[in-house]
């Protein structure tokens, strides 16, 4: 949502696709730049500016963006050379590139740099927006219970909103109405870009990242603990957890929205797609590697192709979804299934023909993030999960020979799923005597590794932000930050901003309701613990927001907050998940009541509650048993505490190397992504991350570099078409077939892949006999 606020604001004149300047725009070449006078040179750009002022602003830009990984090397080198040489010809050219448009090719590819005065606050925009966000919020709540999860994104809403907006005038009456002194019409004119943009902003605000954390809390309570606080608690939980974040985000907009470097890559798909829907003109083949098709027609082809294709991996031939052919050959070989399996293995041959596997679990389209983000995530996945986890697992560390390689479950010392009811009191707190008599908790190798990497990422993001973004934050915190305004930000000034105190009141009001929520129900969450949770959110908003705004990779705070509260108030499982609206809640309640065998591993239509299962396991680890028993020195997973140190040290090493070699590729290394780019694993699998990374490399590196014209014109439209086709097909399959019990006739392509140890989550090297246990001797754990 935040980035999109800049996308549909006013822009200065440019071409439709942002590739070439229009005749009205004054782009100065060396020959056009005025000669430097003896005392006071003038740089003639779209507005006259003194040479000294231009040099100062470029120097400020250089300082703020010195380590910006989204700027190309040539750009930074040109700016540095021009500033040092004080050459007005070079300064004129670079000044236009940096301040009169956007210095980022991604933004120029998707956003026009001129504005049209069009109405947007219309009854049509609000009616369509509210209708579609209501429907999509419910669908996302339902799909979050499915594996792999699927998100109805705002791109889908864009497509559906377009024919509704265009057809509005055909059914609505004419006439002008007067409400509270404000005149409005049911027919405000042709459906336009800004109305469409308002609908998209509503969609991003309602379900920009799928469903809220509160849904995982409710699934963990209802689906795994059998606990239900009722509608009153659920409604307050939904409102407070969603709106507290809006208050914090609004207060931080000077640092996370206004800077040009905060590109919010996911919003670029929205803007490119809206332009494609409203502009059906053909493409200039000289600017797009020979392609002349309009973006609108191209989108339709991709959309239809994606829709038709998903019937195969999603319903007719499900073996195409996880193409782990090696496991089909040896379905009962433990090592083969651990190494090559795509469900609970490492997927060493990561092949999938299913866009859901590539974009599921909130990874989103790999055509969106910049290449450096994809590369860091790929390197992190290979290093930590393929190399390190393989070594740990086959060394027998953490008693891994008795456990799966990769899943999101917790286990006892007999290799069975951890039975939480054996250690709970009637008040849903820990019974220590029962715990000592039962079993310590064990995790799969990748699941345990994920917790260690989460520790490192939380530490790394703080130090990385201070070192690599500290100067930019400092500049924007002072009046000097205005010197960094690009054309998009400057022209947004004609719109009256929301006062900062509105966000402050929202935050304080929702914080007050949060206290009422946790104190009025038996959550066992103390008021002072809630205050600490809010403070953590405030402190980490800027670091995590900067990473998200520049990479499209979201680093969650849930592990850190669960860890802290687990130490402060151990033995209470519900509060660990509380840390982490109405429509999502209603659909969630319906699904939990009416879908047969929901949240069970073998659920017929894959409604296995993957996110809720992870939250449930986290609540057992951090809330019920407590991190002291699992991660402290001398405990089974105590070694993972060293990841805090690693996350604190690595950013300093990277920064030192970047300072020593300022024109090297070191500035593209991101320690938060190296440690935390795989934050969704589990419930995501190595297959998801590896296939996502490989597709990203193809589009964001190979095609972007070799076919820049095509990439600038069609990359984001390709992403939109694939996402929309997949989503609409999935909705039809689930609503019309899965929920009605209509299955495709059985054949090898749908049955054979489900008989492997990888799919059944039974690929373990050793099993204990009846009456035996593995791990620490009985009763020795604390």
Predicted segment positions?
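Alpha-helical multipass membrane-protein architecture
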Residues: 2-782
């Amino acid at each position: 949502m935040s980035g999109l606020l800049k996308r549909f604001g006013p822009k200065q004149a440019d071409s439709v696709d942002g590739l070439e300047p229009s005749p009205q725009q004054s782009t100065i070449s060396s020959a056009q730049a005025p000669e430097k006078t003896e005392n006071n040179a003038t740089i003639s750009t779209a507005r006259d500016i003194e040479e000294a002022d231009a040099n100062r602003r470029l120097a400020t830009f250089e300082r703020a963006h010195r380590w910006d990984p989204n700027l190309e090397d040539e750009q930074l080198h040109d700016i540095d050379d021009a500033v040092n040489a004080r050459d007005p010809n070079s300064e004129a050219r670079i000044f236009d590139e940096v301040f009169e448009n956007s210095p980022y090719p991604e933004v120029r590819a998707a956003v026009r740099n001129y504005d049209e005065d069009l109405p947007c606050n219309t009854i049509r925009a609000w009616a369509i927006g509210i209708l579609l966000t209501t429907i999509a919020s419910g669908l996302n709540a339902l799909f979050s219970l499915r594996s792999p999860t699927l998100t109805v994104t705002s791109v889908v809403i864009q497509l559906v909103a377009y024919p509704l907006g265009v057809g509005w005038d055909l059914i609505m009456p004419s006439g002008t109405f007067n409400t509270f002194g404000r005149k409005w019409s049911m027919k405000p004119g042709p459906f336009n870009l800004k109305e469409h943009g308002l609908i998209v902003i509503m969609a991003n605000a309602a379900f920009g990242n799928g469903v809220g954390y509160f849904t995982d809390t409710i699934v963990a309570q209802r689906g795994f603990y059998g606990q239900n606080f009722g509608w009153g608690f659920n409604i307050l939980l939904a409102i407070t957890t969603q709106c507290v974040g809006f208050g914090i985000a609004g207060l931080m907009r000077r640092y996370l929205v206004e800077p040009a470097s905060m590109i919010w890559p996911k919003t670029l798909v929205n803007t490119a797609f809206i332009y494609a829907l409203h502009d059906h003109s053909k493409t200039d083949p000289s600017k797009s590697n020979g392609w002349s098709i309009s973006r609108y027609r191209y989108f339709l082809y991709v959309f239809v192709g994606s829709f038709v294709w998903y019937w195969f991996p999603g319903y007719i031939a499900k073996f195409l979804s996880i193409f782990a052919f090696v496991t089909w050959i040896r379905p009962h070989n433990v090592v083969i299934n651990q190494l090559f399996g795509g469900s609970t293995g490492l997927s060493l041959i990561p092949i999938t023909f299913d866009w859901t596997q590539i974009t599921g679990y909130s990874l989103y389209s790999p055509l969106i993030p910049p290449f450096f983000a994809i590369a860091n995530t790929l390197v992190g996945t290979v290093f930590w999960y393929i190399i390190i986890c393989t070594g740990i697992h086959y060394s027998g560390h953490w008693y891994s020979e008795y456990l799966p390689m990769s899943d999101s479950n917790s286990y006892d010392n007999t290799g069975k799923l951890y039975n939480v009811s054996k250690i709970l009191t009637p008040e849903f707190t820990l019974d220590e005597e029962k715990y000592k008599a039962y079993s310590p908790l064990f995790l799969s190798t990748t699941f345990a590794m994920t917790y260690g990497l989460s520790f490192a990422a939380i530490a790394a993001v703080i130090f990385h932000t201070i070192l690599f973004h500290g100067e930019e934050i400092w500049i924007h915190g002072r009046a000097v930050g205005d010197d960094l305004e690009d054309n998009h930000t400057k022209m947004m000034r004609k719109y009256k901003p929301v006062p900062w105190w509105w966000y402050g009141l929202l935050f304080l009001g929702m914080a007050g309701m949060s206290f009422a929520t946790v104190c009025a129900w038996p959550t066992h969450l103390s008021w002072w613990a809630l205050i600490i949770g809010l403070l953590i959110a405030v402190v980490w908003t800027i670091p995590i927001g900067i990473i998200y705004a520049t990479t499209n990779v979201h680093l969650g705070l849930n592990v850190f907050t669960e860890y802290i509260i687990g130490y402060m108030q151990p033995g209470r499982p519900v509060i660990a998940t509380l840390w982490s609206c109405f429509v999502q809640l209603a659909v969630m309640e319906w699904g939990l009541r009416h879908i047969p065998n929901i949240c069970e591993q073998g659920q017929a239509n894959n409604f296995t509650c993957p996110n809720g299962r992870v939250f449930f396991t986290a609540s057992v680890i951090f809330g019920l048993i407590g991190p002291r028993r699992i991660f402290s020195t001398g405990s089974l997973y105590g070694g993972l505490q060293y990841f805090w140190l690693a996350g604190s040290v690595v950013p300093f090493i990277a920064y030192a190397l970047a300072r020593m070699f300022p024109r090297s590729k070191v500035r593209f290394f991101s320690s938060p992504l190296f440690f935390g780019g795989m934050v969704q694993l589990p419930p995501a699998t190595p297959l998801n991350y590896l296939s996502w990374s490989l597709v990203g490399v193809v589009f964001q590196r190979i095609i972007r570099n070799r076919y820049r014209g095509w990439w600038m014109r069609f990359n984001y439209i390709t992403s939109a078409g694939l996402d929309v086709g997949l989503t609409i097909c999935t909705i039809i399959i689930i609503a019309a077939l899965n929920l009605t019990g209509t299955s495709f006739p059985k054949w090898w392509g749908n049955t054979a892949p489900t008989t492997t140890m990888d799919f059944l989550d039974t690929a373990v090297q050793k099993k204990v006999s009846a009456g035996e246990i593995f791990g620490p001797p009985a009763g020795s754990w604390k």
